Amino acid sequence: MLAVGPAMDGELPPHEAPPAGSVLYSPPPLQTPLCGPSVQDTMLHYPWWNSFSPTTYPAFSSESHQFMNSSFIMGQPCTDPSYGPAATAPSFPPKSSDFPQDSSYLDDLSNASIFSSSVDSLSDIADTPDFPPADSLSQVPTIWDVSTGPSAHDKLFPPSGTFTGLEDPVSSLSSTPLLISYQAQSQPEEDDEAEEDEAEELGHAETYADYVPSKSKIGRQHPDRVVETSTLSSVPPPDITYTLALPSSDSGALSALQLEAITYACQQHEVLLPSGQRAGFLIGDGAGVGKGRTVAGVILENYLRGRKKALWFSVSNDLKYDAERDLRDIAAPGIAVHALSKIKYGDNTTSEGVLFATYSALIGESQAGGQHRTRIRQILEWCGEAFDGVIVFDECHKAKNASSTKMGKAVLDLQNKLPLARVVYASATGASEPRNMIYMSRLGIWGEGTPFRTFEEFLHAIEKRGVGAMEIVAMDMKVSGMYIARQLSFSGVTFRIEEIPLTPAFERIYNRAALLWAEALGVFQQAADWIGLESRKSLWGQFWSAHQRFFKYLCVAAKVHRLVELAQEELAQDKCVVIGLQSTGEARTREVLGEKEGQLDGFVSAAEGVFLSLIQKHFPSTKRRRERGAGSKRKRRPRGRGAKAPRLVYEAAGVIRISDDSSTESDGGLDSDFHSSPESLLDDDVVIVDAIGLPADDRGPLCPPQRDLHGPGVLERVERLKQDLLAKVQALGRELPVNTLDELIDQLGGPECVAEMTGRKGRVVSRPDGTVAFESRAEQGLSIDHVNLREKERFMSGEKLVAIISEASSSGVSLQADRRVQNQRRRVHMTLELPWSADRAIQQFGRTHRSNQVSAPEYIFLISELAGERRFASIVAKRLESLGALTHGDRRATESRDLSKYNFENKYGARALSCVLTTILSQTESKVPLPQGYPGGDAAFFRDMKQGLLSVGIGGRESRSGCLDVEKDCSISKFLNRILGLEVHKQNALFQYFSDTFDHLIAADKREGKYDMGILDLAPGIDEIYEESQQVFLAPGHPQDGQVVFYKISVDRGLKWEEAYARSLELTGTHDGFYLSYKVRGNKPSCLLAQQNRGKLFTVYKPNIGRQSQLESLDSLSRRFRRVTAEEAREPWESSYTFSLTHCSHTTWNRHCRLVQEGKDCAQGLRLRHHYMLCGALLRVWGRIAAVMADVTSSSYLQIVRLKTKDKKKQVGIKIPEVCVRRVLQELQLMDADVKRKQARTRGLLAPPSTPRPLALPFGPGEVLDLTYSPPAQAFPAPSPFTFPALGPGPGGQLLGAPDTPDAPADPVALLHQGCEINFKEVLEDMLRSLNAAPPAEPPGPLGPLGAGAAGAPAGGAPERQSVIQFSPPFPNS
């Protein structure tokens, strides 16, 4: 293994001049000798060494090839300052004051948890701008499996017999930031004072790093600042081997960013996957970066290469004009764009150009002329069998759920039938969940020749680990050359959540509506019982869908008044307003128009329309049953048989459908679902609930006797129930709010002042005489399709200063403050309805934040204080979190920290829900206190919550124990949807209890070290981070093996006096400043610097640990410390700073430490901390490392961390707890030995040569056998230093940690991996003789790579030697 000398040791501070002969500058001793002293002496003084100049360690520059293909292996010495002495530069920038710098997770090795972190240290931490620009990627070690040859891109995850993939169980916890309230706790004055110093040195630093192409040097700079997630920027892209045919131009039509994406896409298209299909490329650039021009550039590049046909799929036919514009902008006017929708079926006369089509066109069919024709067959015929042109899937997230939709299957089918096509996926959102990646079959992540045989295997492995694993996949995709993801910087963009209180009048209306819906549930059940309705799945599906939509309209209506106020405030400040909506309510407006023959007496209430439509169309009746029976293909069961009574009892409850709790595309969805087959609803989706809040078994039979089903009074009674309910809804409707969109336009000045870009064809407007009327949105000379484009022009020109956009119009519309338009006011983007999915959210947010803008927009999210409405924010937070990982490689990329506190749809949410329902319905004891101040106390809370849950269909049958069973499948989305139907005070109390339980569970997992926050930053805000050593191990793979690198990292967290004094000069608080402790320990008082926060708590800085994570109260400070001047504090501060580099706190106070006296390590209060990281091809070793972790710590959870060293190198990898280091290294050595053994077999070394001779020059990883592995001094804990297992009395050492072999193996290659006596002198003599006489069969290569090189010239003068000796088996004298 390659071992790099320490850049930093625990003996001296890195920024002080070391005395001569210090440990820092001396070669590290061999921890475990591989041969006896006499042999070492002979070997190290052999004159052969003098004939070669010493070489240094490789620089790992991103411009170089992969490490194993670098100049180091090729025999060329390479000088690298990166691993030289770390103490030569005394200049250190001051640390950020906003980050915790303490760590204790390496202290207690007996703790079973991997990462015992305090609550404080994992809270949200402010972003810092201290990451370098992305062009500093030249300093990033290329530790991934990247090669410049084409074969390097054949597969993303090469398979191996020994690679277990991600199939081992690893606890996957979704990342949900905990809401933290700091509370000062009085600390014991004795030994416990040390404990407050220590906290986990992990946290979230910045999310983005500035992006500049690191290896592509062509093109002009992009006009706007572009960023990449810090996680993705931590790994380099592959070297460029493809040369563009595009003509060079200085026009800037294609920026450097876009040319880089074109280059990598075309380079990836040169690769064939193991399945024989051509590899595809994913452009994950964010909205506004210019994906359209990039795609046009790929098409033009292939056109110039002779591939004259291309397919371009998008979401709307209108975007054909954008495609033509993009091709025109990059000077490709000769490429024609043909709209498939304008071409007749069977017409393939167009010979070349771009065939533009929508995804829905893929499933188009025609029966004209008696022939069955399909669009996909027409496309295939146009392309031809050997088609190798470009297929662009633009906005490819629209093809999500490919396995379950006809459209998605067509997308997959097209890719399979054109295996040589050059596929480009382009989307700002990619897919919002891993399961939506199924259509990206050309990425080569799953399938033949990969670790995952099917997409389902990949999905299971990734979802089991949550978003963190997806971040690793994104990095691996980038480094493999199949993915690129940049987006416009969000600097200058402000996010704000406006939580709106409800007025008493609105709350009264809401409570009346909730009670009426509870009554309606009972009425629907009673009517269904009376008429003997058999299958009720469709009925209850419609009921709960309408229930959800009704309360959604109410939630939105509660915010209209506040939104109008905010909009007018912003307009008064010379800004313009963009308002985002998800639905328009047009369907209900048209229904009312039909009922009243086109005459309206006021604005229409969409909420009332939903309720009335449900009753009129779906109320149980015999007429409805007859219609259903006639229209259904299913057999109708005979009704009224006694055997069916239990079925009726069972189905008398409300039914929850999975699809009911997700977005409905339009208001018409309520009607369109009625005739869908109810077989799609499984029986386990049923929730048993009693109509009047009583246990079902107490009500007697739910259906009347059989004779009553046909009695003369039954139908009349059912009809009377319906009419009574209709009357009550109409009475309520007179108080319900009107259509949100119409009211907004009216209050903001009418259609003359508001540019409406929605999908509706008409609207209700106020007339000057006070009446209202319905009018078409179409204008003279314009079709309805072009009205939105005209409205956009009016907004961009400044004619109108308010724009309202809906989901239907949000794709592809640019509304930013463009430099090229007249209206350059700052955009304020307000969201009335948080979109149902991240797909829609990103599309809407990207409308106002794009390239070439004068100013960045402001985003305002309006959320009412209704607890149930947080359901909508919950969806967005979850979707955006996942989206960040999938599209940009970092889950925090698109996650607003304000929104994250509403994210409940994860593992903790499910556990919290189970606890809440069990506690309320089954009256079990809970550790979480109930909400305080509920009217009537705890007893009333349980009674009201139980009744409320039953009234919204959540509950179960009464069991024999007398307690209600918790519904097994009640998910978070169902729960949050249903509690919308509770009175306001009830839903708020219930939601508060749920939130408290949620927080309690997260806090418990944080205490146990099981909480996953995704990729965390190691020691954020600390600059003194160094690589002390690294060891390279081979990892199995196909077609080539990868490698992982084991790093030892040193972190100096101390705060120098100069920095502390400079910080103190900026303090202004009455109690801010330096403090000395009353208690003197070790003849010296403790010293600290206190800075008051906004509240009454103080942030504390100490000389040995920097910023302390535990906040202190003034009372706590005053009790133990006295305030002093800077002059008084200087000497104790400097003394503590120097002493704590090598001595723990116990030694400082007591002059000795019990652990040290026992020969153990004690890191309490030390400035210097050591961490261990495993970087590289992590997916290939994930299962192995997780198994080791589980064995040592009882938890297989792997924490991914990233860091930036003092010399600006960035690393991302698995953090290895110190207690696991020994076992992990042993596992890696065994894996490395297995790979080398496999490589030896493939090279045909099974037949030994007749005479010993050197091996040929190694050209790949694994052909180097390191016989003199020299780990750095004190690389591992002193109590049990890692050593290679001893072999016995002889001087030989066991290589690579392979197990002892009692008998000599028959396989000569195995000799490489068993212990044996080696006469190094004879080995060297044989190798030197062979230099002059090469065997005829195979000429020897030069011996340049024999020296791994020194890490620099130590102070002692002699270079540290690393020898890599190569020979063929059998060993001499073995």
UniProtKB/Swiss-Prot annotation:
Query: Which Gene3D superfamilies does UniProt cross-reference here?
Result: P-loop containing nucleotide triphosphate hydrolases (3.40.50.300)
Instruction: Alphabetically list the UniProt keywords.
Output: Activator, Differentiation, Osteogenesis, Repressor, Transcription, Transcription regulation
- Please give an example of a GO cellular component term from this record: nucleus
Write out the GO MF terms: chromatin DNA binding; histone binding
Q: Where is this region: Disordered?
A: 1-25, 182-207, 620-644, 1280-1303, 1332-1374
GO BP annotations of the record are: bone mineralization; bone trabecula morphogenesis; cellular response to interleukin-11; cellular response to interleukin-6; cellular response to leukemia inhibitory factor; cellular response to lipopolysaccharide; macrophage activation involved in immune response; negative regulation of DNA-templated transcription
Pfam families cross-referenced by the UniProt entry: AAA_34 (PF13872), Helicase_C_4 (PF13871), SBNO (PF25373)
Biased-composition ranges, Low complexity, are: 1351-1360
Q: Where is the composition biased (Acidic residues)?
A: 188-200
**Record's family?**
Belongs to the SBNO family.
Function of the molecule? Seems to have transcriptional repression activity in macrophages.
Under the subunit heading, UniProt states:
Interacts with TAL1; this interaction inhibits TAL1 occupancy of the DCSTAMP promoter, leading to the activation of the DCSTAMP promoter by the transcription factor MITF.
Name of protein:
Protein strawberry notch homolog 2
Q: Which organism is it from?
A: Bos taurus (Bovine)
